[in-house]
A protein has these predicted regions:
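Glycine-rich, basic loop-to-helix element that forms the pyrophosphate-binding segment
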Residues: 59-75
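Conserved donor NDP-sugar-binding/catalytic core segment of glycosyltransferases
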Residues: 91-119
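Hydrophobic helical membrane-anchoring modules
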Residues: 172-232
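Short, well-formed alpha-helical segments that are part of the catalytic scaffolds
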Residues: 11-26
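Short aromatic/hydrophobic "clamp" motif used to bind/position activated sugar donors
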Residues: 80
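Acidic donor-binding loop at a coil-to-helix junction in glycosyltransferase catalytic cores
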Residues: 161-167
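Short beta-strand/loop segment that forms part of the nucleotide-sugar
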Residues: 6, 19-20, 30-40, 57
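A conserved acidic beta->alpha catalytic loop
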Residues: 38-46, 87
Length: 232
């Protein structure tokens, strides 16, 4: 059975649709709970989520890694599925995850698609079918057995950015990782707010700085300097 964990901070515009899509596309009723791990939203995120009858935990520490770990600590099922608040899984996602786990994959993700049509974004998404770490990000969602999640110590809370890169690298050392060839649908809002090509350039710059060993503080300061941030 699956526990879905969604980290949130001021996501009132997206959270209801994401929750509803999860329930709707869980065709075999494998999702037993949705846990909203909120980082202290000042809008109606919690109110919107409460209206959908999901579990809500208010995290003592804000930050995606810390919130996902905190949400996972409340999970009651053997499979954890981490989904961003502005990302919706594909139809039949839960059975796809179950099939992957039963086939010996202890962790994995889906391909990516955006809610805005642009040739560059489509090309970007096409490459997410390949198992290349440079194009593996949290927007693609992440499923993992609770056992393996705990074995790697969860998300590294020192990682303010690229926490998904870190945990996937750790998981690949101890388990088989797969990419399910169906796309999640995620918001293109950062691309539209900052410019598609500029945003992609920023993402790759931050990734390569990460690979070169720059500190999280340097990555975050560079990111915030270059991109318009409404929430973080």
């Amino acid at each position: 059975m699956i526990s879905v964990i969604i980290p949130t901070y001021n996501e009132e515009a997206h959270i209801k649709a994401t929750i509803n899509r999860i329930w709707e596309y869980d065709e075999e009723n494998l999702v037993r709970e949705i846990i909203i791990a909120d980082g202290g939203s000042t809008d109606n995120t919690v109110k919107e989520a409460e209206a959908e009858g999901v579990n809500i935990v208010v995290c003592p520490t804000k930050g995606r890694a810390a919130q996902m770990n905190y949400g996972a600590s409340y999970a009651n099922n053997s499979i954890l599925y981490f989904v961003h608040a502005d990302t919706q899984p594909p139809n039949g996602f839960s059975s796809d995850i179950g099939t992957a786990i039963n086939s010996g994959y202890n962790a994995g993700c889906f391909m990516l698609s955006f809610d805005y049509h642009h040739w560059f974004l489509k090309a970007n998404c096409w490459f997410t079918r390949f198992d290349v770490n440079a194009i593996r990000f949290g927007d693609q969602s992440l499923f993992v057995t609770k056992e393996k999640f705990e074995q790697v110590g969860g998300f590294c809370e020192k990682h303010i950015v690229l926490e998904d890169q870190h945990i996937i690298n750790q998981l690949k050392k101890i388990s088989r990782f797969t990419i399910i060839k169906k796309p999640v649908l995620t918001s293109a809002r950062k691309y539209l707010e900052n410019g598609i090509f500029k945003t992609q350039g920023i993402f790759f710059l931050i990734y390569f700085m990460y690979r070169l060993g720059y500190s999280q503080q340097k990555l975050v300061s560079t990111y915030r300097k270059l991109i318009q941030q409404n929430k973080h």
